[in-house]
């Protein structure tokens, strides 16, 4: 009998569908009353503690999800990724971001070649270069030390490094290394972003890192040319070679741009942009800011989860459990969104990064074989640090739509504060909410409880909380570079598990391309209208033509052949 090509055709999927109605009839109040069940839904690895007992699931549900994983050949797919097989089938590429954080003596192959020596060659180059910049032996064109760095990139070249940078900013070791230095990220092609990035900086002390694998990414290269002009107008064209470096594989274009190809740092086709933070894309700017030793600890943390993911049995495997629970929530319970709620301000950029990792990876409508998916897949990811989110969108989560939540807490704060006379310290106040919110979502508040509190009859419907809203809690011991690396890898592999089970390619992103190609047509029209005064042609639909015409007429003061005008705040 042939193996079903869609996971939804398997007996394991059908078994879960049949199991669903019983779970829907069981409230979390009842499920949480079973201590043995709760204990079975707690897993620990390297002092990372996962509690998923507040999921709408019984032990039987979890066992059925493991059978679904077997039906999807999850273990084999994980092994294929680590073995360098071309699991990105539409682009015929390996998917080996795990190699980026592998120890020097490891062997991970792509197309029969061990790629780890190449990875470490680049890491050694980054270490040498970043140390020379940081100790002042590499200086700018006027002899001044380069204290400020602007990393220019977009998408995965921006969101991942920004997440790690923000998480490290208040870590004692990292922040000590960053004294007197500044790291900024320029992503948006909107000139306002360029203006904000150069505001207050001196070109003489600024190093620009241009991140583009092909060195042709439209937004990134326009921003790079803008900063090149900013540097050369102040210091002369020859200064560019001392103030700009590249993360790219296209050395001819790097050199043509004015950057010494010796100052280009490579990465590879087997690294997807959203999985590239552990490559030169993230390691170079982060090492310039915090020193390579700190960033190496981040890589070691990610590697520890890589090992756990590839070797731990599914019932103790944190990324596997998280991925399977997401499949259950999305495809069976019908919850399309997920809230990522870190109770740490240092993790404020985690949700935007995971939003890209998850939604760009699993926002697909067809299987690896090109078959339309007859079930819901992919998640809408969003989030905000606690307790800020409690005063923003938690209202909807408590009494509106059901949105499964990831609560992430840290035992020891990066920045402890104690005030005499307070009932608890600042971090304990934060964590009081971390522990309370999952129970509030799970248990809710019944009309009977409100009546016992003598709540007015007309207010009871408004103050009733139905509860039965799923969440999980992840508790980290600290939030240093090592733990940040672990957290990143947990979420990366969780996304892969979802894709492997759904049977989709989580490693391409064709949805990004269509808008790019249509923008090319618009760009040509804007040029023709600005320079030649041509009316908007018939190649656009009525709506777009109307909007374009209105835009051009309202911005007719834009010069046809402008002199260079740089942003200024």
From Swiss-Prot:
<protein>
    <recommendedName>
        <fullName>Glucose-6-phosphate isomerase, cytosolic 2</fullName>
        <ecNumber>5.3.1.9</ecNumber>
    </recommendedName>
</protein>
<comment type="pathway">
    <text>Carbohydrate degradation; glycolysis; D-glyceraldehyde 3-phosphate and glycerone phosphate from D-glucose: step 2/4.</text>
</comment>
<dbReference type="GO" id="GO:0006096">
    <property type="term" value="P:glycolytic process"/>
</dbReference>
<feature type="active site" description="Proton donor">
    <location>
        <position position="360"/>
    </location>
</feature>
<dbReference type="Pfam" id="PF00342">
    <property type="entry name" value="PGI"/>
</dbReference>
<dbReference type="InterPro" id="IPR001672">
    <property type="entry name" value="G6P_Isomerase"/>
</dbReference>
<keyword id="KW-0413">Isomerase</keyword>
<dbReference type="GO" id="GO:0006094">
    <property type="term" value="P:gluconeogenesis"/>
</dbReference>
<dbReference type="GO" id="GO:0004347">
    <property type="term" value="F:glucose-6-phosphate isomerase activity"/>
</dbReference>
<keyword id="KW-0324">Glycolysis</keyword>
<comment type="subunit">
    <text>Homodimer.</text>
</comment>
<dbReference type="InterPro" id="IPR035476">
    <property type="entry name" value="SIS_PGI_1"/>
</dbReference>
<keyword id="KW-0312">Gluconeogenesis</keyword>
<dbReference type="InterPro" id="IPR046348">
    <property type="entry name" value="SIS_dom_sf"/>
</dbReference>
<feature type="active site">
    <location>
        <position position="391"/>
    </location>
</feature>
<comment type="similarity">
    <text>Belongs to the GPI family.</text>
</comment>
<feature type="active site">
    <location>
        <position position="516"/>
    </location>
</feature>
<dbReference type="GO" id="GO:0005829">
    <property type="term" value="C:cytosol"/>
</dbReference>
<dbReference type="GO" id="GO:0097367">
    <property type="term" value="F:carbohydrate derivative binding"/>
</dbReference>
<dbReference type="InterPro" id="IPR023096">
    <property type="entry name" value="G6P_Isomerase_C"/>
</dbReference>
<dbReference type="GO" id="GO:0048029">
    <property type="term" value="F:monosaccharide binding"/>
</dbReference>
<dbReference type="GO" id="GO:0051156">
    <property type="term" value="P:glucose 6-phosphate metabolic process"/>
</dbReference>
<dbReference type="InterPro" id="IPR035482">
    <property type="entry name" value="SIS_PGI_2"/>
</dbReference>
<keyword id="KW-0963">Cytoplasm</keyword>
<dbReference type="InterPro" id="IPR018189">
    <property type="entry name" value="Phosphoglucose_isomerase_CS"/>
</dbReference>
